[in-house]
């Protein structure tokens, strides 16, 4: 069977954190698959460039601001159409254990990683349910499954994403909603590059991050994007409420 035969009919796909990393790779994957991609990010300059390259629609949005999210999704429905697939991908992390974390660090991490999903999902769910269903894919992390040193807020927020995803399935699967999460291991994104650049010993830090995976390699944004694409495709129909681990074997032992 050809790749074309596996492609779903063109849909409106909204992706947050779409200007770089996993979000950008996911935008490219869905655009290649023939979908109408709507890219959201707070980095307006980068977003405009990347969206133009894909001939995609883009909106600058502050995911820490409920009013910004609501206005953006109202504009999407007016300008593009009803959302068929929502990919909640945007995320941030702070390098701190609990005692060295500030409340602002903790709150902002949850605002971007978790609370934004409350607002984005509420913005699309009513329309999805009226039309008989829809697809939501949330980017969690293996950090939501295992503890990582100096990532207290990040680990906790990603565990919350997994729980939130399961609750969506429990509440709405019988009405046609498919909600799943992806849990990547260490992925070679710009964010990881910044962590390495500020490390006391970048070479040792890179080695330790690579060795988390049993194959000794980081994943690529494109590999995670392929998993997100699968979960949103007809081939992923039977997956619902799942947390797909893509971690090079990190959590196998």
Language model features with spans:
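Conserved glycine-rich Rossmann-like NAD(P)H-binding loop of the short-chain dehydrogenase/reductase
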Residues: 33-47
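Substrate-binding pocket helix/loop in short-chain dehydrogenase/reductase
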Residues: 97-98, 105-110, 209
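C-terminal substrate-recognition "lid" of short-chain dehydrogenase/reductases
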Residues: 118, 217-246, 251
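Active-site helix of classical SDR
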Residues: 121, 157, 165
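Residue(s) in the substrate-gating loop at a strand-loop-helix junction
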Residues: 141
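Short, small/polar-rich loop/turn modules that mediate ligand/substrate recognition or access, typified
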Residues: 173, 178, 239-241
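Short, flexible catalytic-loop segment of classical short-chain dehydrogenase/reductase
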Residues: 184-194, 198
């Amino acid at each position: 069977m050809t790749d074309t035969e596996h492609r779903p009919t063109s849909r409106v796909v909204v992706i947050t954190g779409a200007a770089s990393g996993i979000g950008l790779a996911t935008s490219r994957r869905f655009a290649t698959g023939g979908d109408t991609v709507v890219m959201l990010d707070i980095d307006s300059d980068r977003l405009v460039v990347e969206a133009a390259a894909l001939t995609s629609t883009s909106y600058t949005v502050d995911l820490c601001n409920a009013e910004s999210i609501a206005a953006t999704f109202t504009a999407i429905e007016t300008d593009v159409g009803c959302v068929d697939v929502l990919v909640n991908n945007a995320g941030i992390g702070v390098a701190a254990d609990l005692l060295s974390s500030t409340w602002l660090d903790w709150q902002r991490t949850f605002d971007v990683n978790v609370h934004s999903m409350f607002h984005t999902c509420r913005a699309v769910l009513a329309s999805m349910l009226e039309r008989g269903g829809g697809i939501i894919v949330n980017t969690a992390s293996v950090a939501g499954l295992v503890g990582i040193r100096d990532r207290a807020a990040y680990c906790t927020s990603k565990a919350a994403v997994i729980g939130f995803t399961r609750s969506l399935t429990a509440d709405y699967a019988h009405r046609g909603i498919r909600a799943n999460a992806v849990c990547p291991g260490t992925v070679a994104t710009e964010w990881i590059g910044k962590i390495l650049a500020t490390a006391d010993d970048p070479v040792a830090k890179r080695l330790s991050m690579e060795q988390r995976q049993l194959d000794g390699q980081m994943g690529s944004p494109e590999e995670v994007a392929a998993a997100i694409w699968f979960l949103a495709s007809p081939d992923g129909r039977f997956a619902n409420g799942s947390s797909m681990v893509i971690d090079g074997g990190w959590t196998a032992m």
